[in-house]
Amino acid sequence: ARTTAPSVYPLVPGCSGTSGSLVTLGCLVKGYFPEPVTVKWNSGALSSGVHTFPAVLQSGLYTLSSSVTVPSSTWSSQTVTCSVAHPATKSNLIKRIEPRRPKPRPPTDICSCDDNLGRPSVFIFPPKPKDILMITLTPKVTCVVVDVSEEEPDVQFSWFVDNVRVFTAQTQPHEEQLNGTFRVVSTLHIQHQDWMSGKEFKCKVNNKDLPSPIEKTISKPRGKARTPQVYTIPPPREQMSKNKVSLTCMVTSFYPASISVEWERNGELEQDYKNTLPVLDSDESYFLYSKLSVDTDSWMRGDIYTCSVVHEALHNHHTQKNLSRSPGK
């Protein structure tokens, strides 16, 4: 796909979603390539209550959404903006998320609901990389419906694999959101080989608030797989005087972007690590960094840390690199 700038659309709650003390606003970033984009609310001033969903690749272009939950009084009295940066096209887009004002007539109108606003939205998400590549795990495709109204809570899901309907999906109980709407999730457990062979998974959603069903599809990205290169980097000497030090795992030159990076200490899984999203490099491969924070004492006594990587292009889909303090250092 060629480099394409995103389009940005503000998402505002329906009339029923603005009556509480909190309101959830959204920003839909659609039709861009390649990854990544960054989304900031009020240029970064709004950071709590922000939830940015993973990007989804459809028909060669990415779509991503971000939401922020703020007090209703903030939205009605202050400007709320969504800023989207797309480095590949040097695009910087800003959208104001504006409250809908009451119509002057008839006087019974509380707010004017545009026909295209306040309806449920549908998102589809791929299986986790580790679930797909480890035969002992069960991969699943997930379909998420947001902004389901209290008045019309029934959501019907239909699932298809290569346009053949399947009936094995599971729908989870409705989750009430802070803005008074509901979130509904349906998951379809899939066969490892169906995803790896490029089969298309489709989620079809119907609800009385929708004029017609919404369909979302997803499949494994096409293209030749490239093997990740894994490098471990010890903590800098300047950190040794602190209580915690940072270990780094750099993973480069992989394709597709779907990858799992985890850490272990002396063979036990660690939790205190952060991964960047995969970033598209100049050669059309991806790279990412993972940072693990550890106690300085643990590092100094020679505990062995392992960066563990799962990717489809690796032999047996798995590799790992150890990192420990060299004696005398």
From Swiss-Prot:
CDD domains: IgC1_CH1_IgEG (cd21817), IgC1_CH3_IgAGD_CH4_IgAEM (cd05768). Residues 223-329 are annotated as: CH3. GO terms for cellular component: immunoglobulin complex, circulating. One of its GO terms (biological process) is antibacterial humoral response. Disulfide bonds join C27-C82, C143-C203, C249-C307. Residues 98-113 are annotated as: Hinge. Residues 1-97 are annotated as: CH1. GO terms for molecular function: antigen binding; immunoglobulin receptor binding. Residues 114-222 are annotated as: CH2. Keywords: Disulfide bond, Immunoglobulin domain. PANTHER family: TAPASIN (PTHR23411). This is Ig gamma-2C chain C region. It comes from Rattus norvegicus.
